[in-house]
Amino acid sequence: MTIKKRALAIDETLALDINGSRQQVRVCATAPGLPPLIVVQQGPGIPLLHEVAKFQRRLDLERDFLVVYWDQRGCGNASAAEALRVSLAQQVADLQAVIAWTADRTQQRVLLFGISLGAAIALLAAAGESTRVRAVIANSPDLQTRAADAAVDAFLRERVRSAGTPRLARALAKLGSPPYLDARSFQRRAVLLTDFDSIERGKTFNALLRELLVGMLKTYGIVGSVRALRNMSAVQSRMLTDVAALDLLSHPPALSVPVHFVFGEQDALTAAFMSGELPGVIGGPGTTAVRVPEAGHLVHFDRPDVVQAIAETA
């Protein structure tokens, strides 16, 4: 679904000083005074500002919210030094600072819109910011890496066996078994998952890569795009050990605000999690969980209608 681009009353890109780091945000809205929403990108290492146009075409969040698109520490057109100063705990602390900045600017509580690892970061950050956060929308959250890795490993082995092609068998053998603690293995798995239609429905890895590169060039320019690609691998190399140990089911964050979990039925990365059980484990009163048909890991792009409706009532 593509939405006609709306005229924006607010559209500004700012550099914020966040815990000793310069980080960029783009703030967009169709009218002043709308409630704030912060988008927390998937990762690790994946920037967000190059996807603003895609978010606006698919989700049109600016109709109802002042949307804060945030490039996390070390991501996008950041220095090489910034990409070496990352950790899961640091990204959580940085998000809490962005929440405080947004709440102070708007004098309203913030809705967090997290994706994949960004959803996990949002959950952890919200646990310490209940006075500033009104709710969390957790799209395809990373909840327990060990279980997710095992489910994906089984999924890939079954798909490769069914395909019966030597090329895929070689790719799976080169990938090896989890955990994946280096950027190259993490990226190899992403290629297989994308081409098996588990990330964004109907999009191959090469199609998403082209989309990524075009978006980066438009947003960061040639030199900035080279930095963004370099930073992606650097941040992954620094953070994958933290991600491998992530387990929010055994150690749930203490949240008093509602969480709205959204999963795609075709998402191998979250297939291990029983969405119906989550409201009793993570989240305050009003927490919900839904698994959406005809959607992969990027459920917000595959089924923007469902995600929009959740955001409107969150």
Question: Where on the chain are the PLM-derived regions?
Answer:
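Conserved acidic catalytic loop of the alpha/beta-hydrolase fold
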Residues: V92-V110
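Catalytic histidine-centered segment of alpha/beta-hydrolase-like enzymes
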Residues: A295-P304
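The serine-hydrolase catalytic nucleophile loop
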Residues: P44-R57
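Alpha/beta-hydrolase
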Residues: R157-R159, A163-S250, V257
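Conserved hydrolase catalytic core segment
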Residues: Q108-A151
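Conserved alpha/beta-hydrolase
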Residues: D60-N77
